[in-house]
């Protein structure tokens, strides 16, 4: 039901107490939680030991400027860099996307973390928050990359989360700091922004993260608070059967929805399976809000990883060094 954030590199007594609540489905990790590779492995183990229930551990490890784990991890290029190769050599570009996905997912899983919220398949059309996180401005090119990235993450044993549905890339506003409104009709969105999502879903994506963007000609609420977007379009028309995550309720774009409790209930009532409460100062209010609400975590069990190699196993895998070398040769260490 809730995926919460914790404050630092170790767990406080209060955070351990939070994890005992059945409403807490897991924890999302950030740069503030990272000190070293060994420390993340220890923190992941401590989180799992803190509760007898299965716990989902997640991170945003996209590459480029959105990479929470640094020292000891590959300096992954932003997706725009991979996408730029497509015009010259589509086959090579898609192979690099597969390898980018495999490398990212393998390192995250080796650290004891189940999934990275990836890939971004928003269109790269000037949005301040998306920027070079997007593969391309062409929906059909992004669709091809979505398929390759799904395959690469799955090859590493990691579930895939497509984001940010139904598409964040065609508005300028950054929803971390402002409300974003996209006035295009559904017919236009279906021919553009939804094309990569349809491709990713068809390729077997396991989850979708919603956008805090309002599409007033489709529904009056931000998409993550809209049953029309989630139940009618995503699950109904597009046939998606996986897990639906909200984006973080601490972002400025959701302030108009109301209180922490109002945001949590609105997401769940609209059809989100999991609500992200990334700021620790909001966790108590979120837990109070859902007290007594029935928790259904069955959908999440399939996202919790099994059989990861660990770092010793990954470092011994011949694919690891060769893929690292190819990405380094192509992109250097620039992020």
UniProtKB/Swiss-Prot annotation:
Belongs to the glycosyl hydrolase 3 family. NagZ subfamily. Pathway: Cell wall biogenesis; peptidoglycan recycling. The active site is at 176 (proton donor/acceptor), 247 (nucleophile). Gene3D superfamilies: Glycoside hydrolase, family 3, N-terminal domain (3.20.20.300). Coiled coil: none annotated. The keyword Protease does not apply. The record marks 174 as: Important for catalytic activity. One of its GO terms (cellular component) is cytoplasm. Pfam families: Glyco_hydro_3. It is an enzyme of class 3 (hydrolase). HAMAP family: NagZ. This is Beta-hexosaminidase. One of its GO terms (molecular function) is beta-N-acetylhexosaminidase activity. It catalyses: Hydrolysis of terminal non-reducing N-acetyl-D-hexosamine residues in N-acetyl-beta-D-hexosaminides. Plays a role in peptidoglycan recycling by cleaving the terminal beta-1,4-linked N-acetylglucosamine (GlcNAc) from peptide-linked peptidoglycan fragments, giving rise to free GlcNAc, anhydro-N-acetylmuramic acid and anhydro-N-acetylmuramic acid-linked peptides. SUPFAM superfamilies: (Trans)glycosidases.
């Amino acid at each position: 039901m809730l995926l919460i954030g914790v404050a630092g590199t170790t767990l406080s007594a209060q955070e351990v107490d939070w994890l005992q609540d059945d409403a807490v489905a897991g924890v999302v990790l950030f740069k503030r939680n990272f000190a070293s590779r060994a420390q993340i492995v220890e923190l992941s183990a401590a989180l799992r030991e803190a509760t007898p229930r299965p716990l989902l551990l997640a991170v945003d490890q996209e590459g480029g400027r959105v990479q929470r784990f640094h020292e000891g991890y590959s300096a992954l290029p932003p997706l725009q860099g991979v996408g730029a190769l497509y015009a010259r050599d589509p086959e090579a570009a898609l192979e690099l996307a597969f390898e980018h996905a495999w490398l990212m997912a393998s390192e995250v899983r080796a650290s004891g973390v189940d999934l990275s919220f990836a890939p971004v398949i928003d269109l790269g059309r000037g949005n301040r928050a998306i920027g070079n996180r997007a593969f391309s401005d062409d929906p059909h090119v992004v669709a091809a990359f979505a398929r390759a990235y799904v395959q690469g993450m799955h090859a590493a044993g990691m579930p895939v989360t497509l984001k940010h549905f139904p598409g964040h890339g065609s508005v300028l506003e950054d929803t971390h700091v402002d409300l974003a409104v996209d006035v295009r009709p559904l017919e236009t969105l279906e021919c553009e922004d939804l094309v990569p999502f349809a491709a990713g879903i068809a390729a077997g994506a396991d989850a979708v993260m919603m956008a805090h963007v309002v599409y007033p000609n489709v529904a009056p609420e931000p998409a993550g608070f809209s049953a029309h977007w989630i139940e009618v379009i995503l699950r109904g028309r597009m046939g998606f059967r996986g897990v639906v995550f909200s984006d973080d309720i601490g972002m400025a774009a959701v302030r108009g929805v109301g209180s922490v409790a109002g945001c949590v209930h609105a997401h769940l009532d609209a059809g989100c399976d999991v609500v992200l409460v990334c700021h620790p100062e909001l966790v108590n209010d979120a837990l109070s809000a859902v007290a007594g609400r029935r928790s259904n975590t069955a959908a999440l069990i399939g996202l919790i990883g099994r059989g990861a190699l660990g770092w010793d196993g990954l470092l011994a895998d011949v694919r690891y060094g060769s893929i690292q070398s190819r990405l380094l040769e192509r992109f250097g260490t620039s992020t």
